[in-house]
Amino acid sequence: MEAPAITRRRRPFLAPIWLPALLGVIAVVLAVLAYRSVTTTTVVLVRHAEKALSTIDDPPLSPEGEQRSERLAQIFGEREGAGHLDAIYVTNTRRTQQTAAPLAARLRLVPVVLSGVDVAGTAARLLSEHRGGTLLIIGHSNTLPQLVRELSGKDIKPIAENDYSDIYVLSVPRLGGASVLRMKY
C-alpha cells in the first residue's frame, strides 16, 4: 500500500480578509502623513509693551507697558481649547520678558529666550518644532518685520518707534501660501 501524498492545502478564503486589512492600514498611515504635511502653524508676533523712559540700555516696562502686558494675557490667556498657545518666545531683553510674564504665568509656560541674529534659521526652526501648533513671539520694532518676512514671505510696513499696539497673526500652512493678519490691542 502506498502512502498518501502530503499536499499543502491553500486557504484562499483568508486572502480576501488580510489583503483589505493591510491596504486599510497603509491608507491610514498615508492619511496621517498627508495630514501632518499640510497642517497649518499659527505664529502670533507682538512688539514688547511700552518701555520706561530711561538712559539704561535695557529699560523695564512703563506703567502703560505693564497694563498692555496684562491685556495680552487676557487676550491669549486661555489654556485649553482652540487657539491656545503652545509656546512663548522672547528675546534676552527685560522688556520682552516683562511683556510675556503675565501671560506665561497664566498659561504656566516658561518663555523661551531666542538667541542669535540668524532670523532665517530661527524662523525655520520654530516652524519645524511647532508644526501645527500656535506660538507667540515677543520681539522688537526692528526684528518683527524680518521675522514676518521669513515666516510668511510677506513684507509688513516698518513699525514706528512709538507703536506698541500691533498684533500680527500668521497662518503658515505646510503647503501653500501663508497669510498675515494685523490687529490692534
Residue ranges and their predicted role:
Residues E2-A34, V38-G132, T143-Y185:
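Active-site-proximal alpha-helix that buttresses catalytic centers in soluble enzyme cores
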Residues H140:
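Conserved alpha/beta-hydrolase "nucleophile elbow" surrounding the catalytic nucleophile
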